[in-house]
Amino acid sequence: MYAYNKMGRVPELVICSFIVVTLLVIHFFSDLLRASLGGYYNQDVTLSQLVESQNSDYAWFLKLLVNCFGYSCVFVPGFLIYKYVGRINYLERGNKTFLHKAINMCITGNSGYDQLDAGTSTADKDRPAASTAPKRTSSQEAVQLLWCFGGLMISYLTWGVLQEKIMTQNYLNFTGESAKFKDSQFLVFSNRLLAFLVALAYLQWQPSPVRHRAPLYKYSYASFSNIMSAWFQYEALKFVNFPTQVLAKSCKIIPVMLMGKIMSKAKYESYEYVTALLISLGMIFFMSGSSDSSKASGVTTLTGIFLLSMYMVFDSFTANWQGSLFKSYGMTPLQMMCGVNLFSSIFTGASLSMQGGFMDSLAFATEHPKFVFDMVVLSVCSAVGQLFIYHTIDVFGPVVFTIIMTLRQAVAIMLSCFIYQHSISLLGIFGVLIVFVAIFLRVYCTQRLRAIRKRAEANKPKMAV
């Protein structure tokens, strides 16, 4: 019996060795990178500080490589463990240790835990479905719409203003010296960690009747693309202004359609192609008609456009991957929010730890109290905004949500121009109008086509039995 237990622990020891050896190898290579960047003679300087000290228009590329190197702290041991447990049929064994349950939950979605299952109790099963809820009156509907509109507007307008402030403005310390916060990844980490905690708390407070069935590792792909898109979004603000970024986000319809064609073999209507082209045309007019003296370099403009393009590519993959997960496993949006933000927190936390970015960001925070306030409010707005997104789509559907967010983008551009003194010519304003007209046209055509199809389905003659 003793020999059996001893042999039964061998897989756990091998799995732990994968993690330890990977971390040691990554630590070794990070030391080599520090030395190559000039940190050999100054051991007090972190890798994150060395990367930030590279004064170049292309320093963001080095930062990106270092970030991805940090993410490998999670990806590499995860991949090795996945291959190893499949090869030895580890999950079919009867030893129900904590490690066995954790790996089982990551690979198959089955575990003995309730944190993400959110709905396995008898009380949840007896709870009436949403479809049986009493129908709201017109006044109640109006109040609910105002609540959703106000929540989305306040949370995301505040988030947009603070996002631009943190990445572009100087903060004063206690001695009156000014400095900029540079670590975009720390902002991504704080946003995702708070969003994960909010989603987890909400699932515990109001469990969903839908049992969670998806393997946790499936969320890692959406998490990686999500943190990459967020990082590119923050970095882009160092090279282009916020109105440009907001308009560029409207153009993500094009990469979403392309990614849908590639991943899901999706088919699109002719009006979808027309509106996508109109949005692109409007964006070209806006870029041609907007100017910002603080970002006059051609290199920085091209860099900003490239960063925004990468943001749209990764964001498009996130949307399509999440859509495929919803179809395959039928989880609720809050379960998706919880799972994606869990892995996003793990990825960014591992990368920050490897670079020493935690200490740098915390040191900046202790010296600049206004930054702490802005960062906390930014994270709260991001988390609360996600809750309002899911609530609005659940109550009113995606069309109403799209209209609200389109109005939010228009107001965000005006706010940014007013607060941060961005100048836009008449050609730029015309480009903005084209973009928003195209978005509303797209929403109208979608609704119109859906109504026509419903009528055609209702008028279809029934076959006699």
Curated annotation (Swiss-Prot):
Primary subcellular site in the record, as a coarse category: Golgi
GO molecular function: 3'-phosphoadenosine 5'-phosphosulfate transmembrane transporter activity
Name used for this protein in its record: Adenosine 3'-phospho 5'-phosphosulfate transporter 1
Tissue: Expressed throughout embryogenesis. During oogenesis, it is expressed strongly in the nurse cells of the germline. Maternally expressed at the syncytial blastoderm stage. Zygotically expressed, from after germ-band elongation in the invaginating salivary gland placodes. Remains expressed predominantly in this tissue throughout embryogenesis, but low-level expression may also be present throughout the embryo.
Compartments, as annotated in UniProt: Golgi apparatus membrane
Organism lineage string: Eukaryota, Metazoa, Ecdysozoa, Arthropoda, Hexapoda
Keywords from the named record: Developmental protein, Golgi apparatus, Membrane, Transmembrane, Transmembrane helix, Transport
PANTHER family for this protein: ADENOSINE 3'-PHOSPHO 5'-PHOSPHOSULFATE TRANSPORTER 1, SOLUTE CARRIER FAMILY 35 MEMBER B
Membrane-spanning intervals of the chain: 13-33, 61-81, 142-162, 185-205, 270-290, 299-319, 339-359, 370-390, 391-407, 424-444
UniProt cross-references to InterPro entries, sorted A to Z: SCL35B1-4/HUT1
